[in-house]
Structure formats: structure tokens, C-alpha cells
Amino acid sequence: MGSDYITITITLASPSLNQKPPRARWANTDWETLDRIIKGFKVPDAPSCPTPPKLDEWMSEWLNPLVALLKEHTLVCRPSHHCKPWWTPHLTILCREYYKAARSARKNDTPHMRELGGTSKAGYFKAIKAAKNKHWCSFLLAATPQSLWRAKRFAYGRAQPRFPSLPGAETPQQMNTVLLNHFFYPKEPCSPPPRLRPHKSAPSLTTEEIDAALAQCSLTSAPGPDGIPYSTWKQVNKINASILLRILAPLVLLRYHPASLKGSNGVVLDKPGKPSYESPSSFRIIVLIRTFANILAWIIAVRLLAAARLSRLLHPNRCGSLPGLSTYNACLTLTNDVKTLQRPRLKVSPLFLDIKAGFDNVDNNTLARILSEGGIPNYLVSWGSSFLGERSCTLIFQGAPGTPAPVIVGAPQGSPISPLLFLLYVSPLHFRIPWGLMISYVDDFALTVASLSYGGTIRRLQKLFKKLERKASRLGISFSVAKTELIHWRTPSQRHSAKWVAHIHIKGEVFHPSNSVRWLGYWFTPALDPAAHFSRRIYLPRVHAPSFVASVLPEQASPPIYATDWRHH
């Protein structure tokens, strides 16, 4: 062999079918058999003053068998591309005749046999098209407001998820590390207490609190790593309410969140409309937590919200993730106060800000200090510290290694208590503004000031932004400069004024006043004309509805809807 030849190693392997793993069909759980078993399921008392590992062991000893019991009596389905919901017995007969005629035409290549094979083929595929249209039409006739979006997904198809392409990360393991370091900043972990002791002033957990928490849980929420939905826990609690009560009650009294409930899956999704996807900031992570952990989080969230309102830790202009305060309330408050400031013929200007990666920057020690200084009961502060500490997350994307990684900082966005913890974390940012106001909705802030001129409002906004930035730096958070927007409100008498074009300098960048700003889903114009918002909302259905209706008509090519292969676990 000459030097021009290089030995090539070839490995032969069976093709990968990329079959999806079986998943439980919780709508077909055998509750008749489980009813008797769950009624006799007994949970012993938790240790009185255990160490954290001892309580984790007790938690896993009784929760894991319960989860295994539920999965054992639940059917599993394996998605298959060979099972079609529109398939009929008549198509089976036509399929056999078609393949029989095709084989005969290949064996006896005569004009008569070729014509017979072509006729059989045309009839077979025509029957397939008719069966698809019939099934699609019946699916649309039975559509509900919720399943209509499912029909749209079938009609348009689902976009393939982007594979992260990050500089300096060539392997899935390197990409996993880069994404973890971007979203969950490395930090020294907090050490848990050596021994857990019951809090004397903590109210005992009641079945009413558990029922109220389960009522808040949505049946359409995606489950966490264990795959159990809220509907299953609701049925378990309905059969035997003592199970959830005896497992969750010690966790409240001992102010502890077990390690077995801190594991989560982080689904990496690309943000639509980004010019480039070579940066981790072009992606977002949706954290999926075990539903059992979220039940406890709902209970603590209700107690924490009541304590925060009692201690006046939440500012009156703080909206978002609070009952009864929606985006409509925030926008209505902003509009009403702007008109009030304009009555003395003052110029009014707002600056819209957005906190960068707000949930990912929540520091455990800082939050505990804010809650303690705000008068929150000690058992809620301790439970919050335990909830945020020593978590783990397994990133899910194409080619992900699937290894859990420790998460030291940040609040998981998939938990019902995380929005409230974030609101309390940024509560020190709110301060009183003379002749102005500050309104916030989760991580969106609006600074509005009034002055005799627009130049005066710009100077006031710059001073207030520096003050707000100093407060934010103490919390370890910052504002996204790219999402900053400025607008100057105008009254009808100021419509033809040429002095409202004053711009503002923020961190070395110049922001000119916009003719329209979209904040919290509402469109604002300098004249506060509501027609600017409603005209856009009315225009969108007129543009997108015809294409959507055309795509779901039965006469069109029906999208493939795959059924499942049912098997008992």
C-alpha cells in the first residue's frame, strides 16, 4: 500500500429509528383498582427533629412508592407513525388489493395488468384522501376553544427546535455548560441547617389549604421529571386526603423543601425573531418541576402573600402575579395618573425599563434578608431559603447529555411561588417620586415624571434612572438597555409643539421618543389615543384568520395526525 492511501475505519450498526419513549396515558388510569389501594395507603409520622438527609430519606421512602403505584396502574402509549387515526377496515382491503395488483403487474408485464394496477393504485390513494378529509372534518366539528389551537398546530405544523450554535461550544457537553453558566450563574452554595426543628408559631397545614392549592393547579400544565399531572394528585387527594396532608405537613412545620422535589427539567427554547442565534441570550429556559412540589409551593405562596400584604412589603403600584392585579390595572393606573399630572399644563414623559434575566438573578441570602427585615414570619423565610438552595436542573435540547447540574442562584420560573419571590426581591426598587409615579409589572418598570418642559422631564428621568440603577446593583440585577423606550405624552393643546422631541442618554446610548410604545401588551401613543391599540388588535384577526381558516378546510391537504400504540405497563 502506497503512502497516498490512508486506512479508513468503517463501523456498521443498525439504523436508529429515533422512537419516542413510551409515556403514561393518565386519562386511562385504573382508578377502580387504585381506589382500594390508596384508601389503605398509610404514611407514618415524620421524624421529630431530623437532619436534612434523614428527612429526605423519609420523604423518598413514602413518596416514591406512591408514584410507582400510580404509574403501575396507568396505561402507557408509544407514539407510532404506522398508526393512523383515519385508517378504516375498507382501506385495509384496498391496500391488499393494491399491493396484489402491483405484484401481478411486475410479474406479468402486460397492458391489461398495468392498467389494472394503475386503477387499483388510483382508487387506493383516492380512498386515503377521502378518509383523511372525513376524519379532519369530524375533528373540526368537535373542536372546542381549547382544541382549536391544536387544530392550528396540525394545520401549520410545528417548527423544528433550533440546535444551539454557540461560539466556543462544539460538543453537547460544552453547550450544556455554556447555557448553565449563562442562565444560572456560579456561586457558593448555602449550607443547610445541621438539624431541623419544628417552628412553634407556624400554623398547622389543613386539608382546606391543600384543596385550595389543587384548585389553583391547571390541568393543562406540563408535568415535571416524574411525568405525573395535577389531575392525578387531585384524584389521589379525593380518595384519601390524609396522604398529601401527612407528607406535606411536616415540611411546613420543619421549614424544609426536600432535595427529591428540587430536581427539574429545563427545556431550552429559542426566542422567535432574533437576528442571530449564536448567543445564549437568544434562548430561554422553561423549567418543569414535579407537580407534587408545586402543590407545596402553592400553599406557601398563599401564606407568604398574606404575610407580605400584612407587613406592607408590596408597594401599591406593584402589579403582576398578584390576585386581582393584571396588565389592565397597571395600564389603567398609568393612563389615569398621566392625565392627572397633565391637568396643571405640565409636560409628562415616561421611561419604560425591563430587568435583564430577573428570575435568574434572585440571590438566596439577599431575599432572606429582605423578607426578615420586612416582617415576614421566620418559618416562611426559612422555607424560602430551603426552596431556592441546592436545586438541580437537567437541560433538554437536541443532543443534550441529560446530566443534572447544580443550580445555586435564581428562582425557577416553573414554580407558582417564584413570581411572588421575585416581586418581594425587587420590592426595594420602589420609591416615591414627587410629581411622578413608578409602576411595575413583574420585571417591567415604567418611570413617569412631570415638569414644565420636556427637557426638564428628561433631566428628572436621568436622575431617577441612576438612583434606580444603584438600588438594582445592590440586589445584583440590572436593566436591559436594548429594551428601554421613551415617549412624551401630549395633550391636544400640545399637539403642534416642536419641543417634545427631547431625547435621553442611558448608559452611553441615545433613545429618541417613539411615536408608539407597546407595554404589557397595550399600545400607547403620545396622545393616549386608545384607537392605536384597538386598531392593531382588530387588524390582526383580519389578516391571520383567512389564512388559518383556509389551512384547516377539509378540502385542503389534511395534516398528518398520528395515533398511539396502546399497551399496558
PLM region descriptions:
Residues 357-374, 445-470, 528:
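Catalytic palm subdomain of template-directed nucleic-acid polymerases
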Residues 300-319, 343, 348, 419-452:
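Active-site palm subdomain of RNA-directed nucleic acid polymerases
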Residues 43-79, 183, 232, 236-265:
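Amphipathic alpha-helical blocks
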Residues 200, 463-466, 477-515:
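Short, conserved micro-motifs composed of acidic
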Residues 77-79, 84-89, 126-127, 135-142, ...:
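Non-catalytic, peripheral interaction segments enriched in hydrophobic/basic residues
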Residues 12-17, 26, 59-62, 73-77, ...:
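Basic/polar low-complexity segments
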Residues 200-412:
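Conserved pre-catalytic core of RNA-dependent polymerases
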Residues 1-81, 173-177, 530-548:
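Surface polyanion/phosphate-binding segment centered on an Asp-His-Pro turn
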